[in-house]
Amino acid sequence: MKILLAVVIVAISSTIACADEPPVIPVGLDAYRMWDRWPHQRIGARAYMRSTYDRTGGNRGPDASHFLYQLADDHNVTLDVAGAGVLYFARYNHWHGSPWHYVVDGTDHIVRETSTADPNKPAENSVFIPEAPLPTPLTWTWLVTKGADLMWVPIGFEKSFQMAYSRTRYGTGYYIYHHYVPGARLSQPICAWDAKTAPTSDVLDLLRAAGTDIAPPGNLVQGKLSIPKEGELRVARLAALEPSGGVVRALTFSVPKSSALALSNVRLRVTWDDRPEPSIDAPLALFFGAGTLYNRDGREYLVKALPVNIRFADDRVHLACYFPMPFFRSATISLAGAGEEIADVKWTARFENLAVPKNHVGYFHATYRDHPKPEHGQDMVLLDTRTVEGGGDWTGTFVGTSFIFSHNAVLTTLEGDPRFFFDDSNSPQAQGTGTEEWGGGGDYWGGRNMTLPLAGHPCGAPSAKEAKDDHDKIQSAYRFLLADLMPFGRNARICLEHGSVNESKEHYETVTYWYGLPGASVVPTDELKIGDEASEEAHAYASPDASAPYRIKSRYELGPHELDGKETYPAHEDVGRVTKTASEFTLKVRPDNFGVMLRRKLDYAYPNQRADVFIAEVSEGSRDVFWKLAGVWYTAGSNACIYSNPREELGETQHNVVVSNRRFRDDEFLIGRELTQGKDAIRVRVKFTPVNIPLFPGYPLTETAWSEINYKAYCFVMPPMPK
């Protein structure tokens, strides 16, 4: 047995960026071209995932066809965003909803799927239309995905974006988009999508390369070993010379096919810089994207994803990982036995120098959680960075999950919604419609398997009766985030509903992939509590036309508030005001900020809240205030929505009004650094600009107003250099 104990990496002489300035954020197609920047901090970027979920917390539909409002029977709005940004992902159930309206900066582009022509006889070789700007492998349709239409083409917008469905039968969908703080260091300007320009071949070629070795050559170390039945075996220790650091660019293992099942539950552990706990600690199979290495139908690729793959060839099974994994001093790679000795294990690792400042990147983490008995009525917590690896603040990005959702080929677990929370938000900034939707499928994948560059259902029999043995009953899926990754600057809480309403008794296992550096890049600096006399006075709050403070008892948007007669999410009280004119207040900020995020808690019973936001300097003794426009703050929809889900493919649009008991919501607005940097306080003015849109044509208008319960200021800052 040959084990490499240490490898010295030659240090580079200088770095190519400044540690005091945020790294460049890859935008649009650059997010694919610059995939080697997966570990980089996204300071000033925020991700949001919206969907057609049941607003009452249940599983009506299931989670299909809930719309913000209807402009016409063939224009059912499901996403409405103000400001510049990029839509990075959209998922639909089969062709349902097509034709879709992609309204970019006021221009209505019609996007179709070829099954639209006759949805009762769907086209098996369906594609997105227009095909040139929406090509495979940035898009996939239901025959390949086994139930979903998926779109990863970046859709840029400079002022606004709306998405609407023309048809509402089974209109399930979720969508991921990014906003950027004005003045953020972007790799290219955001340009409005024109529905004509085709993605460049380099991006398509990258995604077509899924399943192959996509990493640069680098420095290679390799070896051969036997994994003991018990205990932990060090595979390699990589050492970096200061002040450079290194990046693991490829990590592979292979065993004879006869040892594949035994390898499934061997634990991979990787510790960066001799930290007290490993940042990667997960069963090998699940880490590489599959719940088991059982290959039910003898496929070459069990997993053919971009960052990982599992390939059966040459009488061996090969596992490869190409996530870039930075370290600053050392990387220790170990394997822990799982009850059976495994011989003839071959491994390789490739690495290169870290060519950027250390506080520009984060460690790679794969956090494993075992959920043998999910808690009744509560979401499973796949990751809470406040408690993992010593807890505290972390700054980084959430980049995916690999998860087992049943050990018994039970597929009803797939009704569970993903909900993700970032940087103290009480509202999920990401709310999905179901578990197989998150994994890139639809309708439980029809019980079939599939593997794509960024999503897949690699293993599991269609049913327990059809399983060839117990290994074949293990159902798993994966979802990786590249262009659509989700940044956080302080903490991340990644949750998944089990079953349709947190009632499942199935055994789940999850691996959550994320990049994170200890420390914060989003820092709270102040809070104004509306209705609190002392807080209003301290923040010079002024809103002459605002209502008197009023009490609200309600909830945030989570799962069912009651299950089996027991309350799961109790209501709570808070105090707020509403105004139909303007409010002003002062908030403290850090002078070294790179922009400020305002977070507002609001009463979501008031629909389509929109305001122009102005910023001024705080100057003692001066009566002159010079306001500068920071942008438009818009929160589309309300706790009332439209549900339209006719039974027939071409059924008439319905106008069912659904009102939830969830009136609390946290919402965010980004202020550019040119208005905030170098200041220790800013004066904020929000001027209400009403948006009068009925839930559907002819429905009475609901009273509109700007709701304020609290305002919090968070500053974007550079994270500290690693110790």
Give the residues covered by each predicted segment.
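Beta-strand-rich ligand-recognition modules
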Residues: 120-158, 301-305, 309-320, 326, ...
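Beta-strand-centric surfaces of beta-sandwich/beta-rich domains
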Residues: 20-551, 573, 580, 602
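Bacterial N-terminal signal peptides
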Residues: 5-14
